[in-house]
């Protein structure tokens, strides 16, 4: 392996812009080596076709305890020792556990949820309207972007309505770019403790929700332990939540930067699905999703990767691949899509389980927000938006708006 490899993760170029290194590597060295926090080396894959190969190759493993698996931080290395959930499993265990919760997230199930999603969005916008902005701008993240996905996933899990606000606060602490590691860790534990109590309750008194299903269909027959049910619930709760909060805020900021496309969406809210599709390509809010280790020697692009070497495939870089997307650095909700998929939700068997739910939520948000508040504006200069730190996933910490 090469010495003198650049340190990874890269920092973003500026607020919403992906790291400049990705474009350079796609052009000159699309499969190259990078140095991780502990001095170890891994292969970084930056082009769309190679990222898709990494996501689907059976010669690569998702199991974090395997030799060479690339962890990006000390806390990641620690987390890898915990009992895994399906996102960190290979076949056949992966599909076996994933199928326990998959029925909740099918297109059909999400369609049945649509009235609840719409009601949640409407209620939160109505609350914002009642508060008004006569006393100054309102933080769209706190009042809207955070509670929308939080309330929906909590309700699916079976959290009583009275606890939604408290749990949403805990979730905000663990995902907010400005919280300390200790605060985030304490909030994590609060959520795990809460879910453990809920699992105990649902074992005795099941209802119609994900945790009850796990208890009735999996824990009671002895297929999984109670601790597994808690970890699966926690995964579903946290995996996409910060990403969704960020995508809502990034969507509003992006429309403010593209007034012509905002005018289009206001005039025709049925364009929301294509806006969401482009949003998820342009701002790949979880930049480092696809990590593997080689089970055997394998060619990736033009490089030979040896057994037990780590691989990081950047779906964020793949979504800006010039060979796949025309003018990839332009935000264009009217773009003509190539046959290849954008990779905002990953690719292959490990593709995000809640993709249909996430798109339904985002589509509902952007088809409703500007109908309810046609005069909604970002209340700070666009160059002064408070983006997450440049070494974290792209997002917005708070977004003052007036309407």
From Swiss-Prot:
Cyanide, CO, and oxygen strongly inhibit catalytic activity. The modification N-acetylalanine is found at residue 2. Heme binds at residue 352. Its EC number is 1.7.1.14. It catalyses: nitrous oxide + NADP(+) + H2O = 2 nitric oxide + NADPH + H(+); nitrous oxide + NAD(+) + H2O = 2 nitric oxide + NADH + H(+). Its cofactor is heme. Changing residue 393 to V/L: Impairs catalytic activity. Pfam families: p450. Keywords: Acetylation, Heme, Iron, Metal-binding, Monooxygenase, NAD, NADP, Oxidoreductase. Induction: By nitrate/nitrite. Residues 1-21 are annotated as: Disordered. It is an enzyme of class 1 (oxidoreductase). The keyword DNA repair does not apply. Changing residue 77 to A: Decreases the NADPH-dependent activity. GO terms for molecular function: heme binding; iron ion binding; monooxygenase activity; nitric oxide reductase (NAD(P)H) activity; oxidoreductase activity, acting on paired donors, with incorporation or reduction of molecular oxygen. Changing residue 73 to A: Decreases the NADPH-dependent activity. Gene3D superfamilies: Cytochrome P450. It comes from the Eukaryota. Belongs to the cytochrome P450 family. Nitric oxide reductase which is involved in a dissimilatory reduction of nitrite. Acts as a nitric oxide reductase. Is able to reduce nitrate and nitrite to a gaseous form of N(2)O when oxygen supply is limited or discontinued. May function as a detoxification mechanism. This is NADP nitrous oxide-forming nitric oxide reductase. It comes from Fusarium oxysporum (Fusarium vascular wilt). The lineage of its organism: Eukaryota, Fungi, Dikarya, Ascomycota, Pezizomycotina.
């Amino acid at each position: 392996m090469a010495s003198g490899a650049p340190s990874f993760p890269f920092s973003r170029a500026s607020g919403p812009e992906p790291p400049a290194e990705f474009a350079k590597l796609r052009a000159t060295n699309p499969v190259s080596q990078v140095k991780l926090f502990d001095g170890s080396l891994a292969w970084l894959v930056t082009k769309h076709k190679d990222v898709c190969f990494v996501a689907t190759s059976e010669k690569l493993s998702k199991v974090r305890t395997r030799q060479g698996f690339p962890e990006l931080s000390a806390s990641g290395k620690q987390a890898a020792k915990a009992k895994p959930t399906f996102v960190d499993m290979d076949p056949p265990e992966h599909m076996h556990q994933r199928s326990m919760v998959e029925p909740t997230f099918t297109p059909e199930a999400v369609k049945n949820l649509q009235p609840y999603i719409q009601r949640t969005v409407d209620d939160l916008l109505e609350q914002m309207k009642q508060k008004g902005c006569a006393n100054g701008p309102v933080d769209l993240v706190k009042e809207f972007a955070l509670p929308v996905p939080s309330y929906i996933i909590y309700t699916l899990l079976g959290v009583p309505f009275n606890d939604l606000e408290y749990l949403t606060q805990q979730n905000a602490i663990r995902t907010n770019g400005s919280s300390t590691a200790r605060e985030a860790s304490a909030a994590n534990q609060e959520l795990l403790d809460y879910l453990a109590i809920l699992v105990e309750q649902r074992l005795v008194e099941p209802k119609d929700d994900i945790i009850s299903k796990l208890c009735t269909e999996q824990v009671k027959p002895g297929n999984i332990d109670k601790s597994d049910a808690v970890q699966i619930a926690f995964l579903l709760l946290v995996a996409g939540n910060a990403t969704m909060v960020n995508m809502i805020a990034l969507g509003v900021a992006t429309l403010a930067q593209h007034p012509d496309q905002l005018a289009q969406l206001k005039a025709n809210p049925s364009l929301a699905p294509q806006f969401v599709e482009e949003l998820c390509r342009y701002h790949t809010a979880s930049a480092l999703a696809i990590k593997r280790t080689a089970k055997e020697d394998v060619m990736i692009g033009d490089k030979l990767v040896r057994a037990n070497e780590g691989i990081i495939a950047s779906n964020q870089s793949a979504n800006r691949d010039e060979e796949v997307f025309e003018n990839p650095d332009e935000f264009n909700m009217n773009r003509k899509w190539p046959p290849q998929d954008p990779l905002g939700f990953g690719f292959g068997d490990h593709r995000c389980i809640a993709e249909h739910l996430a798109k339904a939520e985002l589509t509902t948000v952007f088809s409703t927000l500007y109908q309810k508040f046609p005069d909604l504006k970002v209340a700070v200069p666009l160059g002064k938006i408070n983006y997450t730190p440049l070494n974290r996933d792209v997002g917005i910490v708070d977004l003052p708006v007036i309407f």
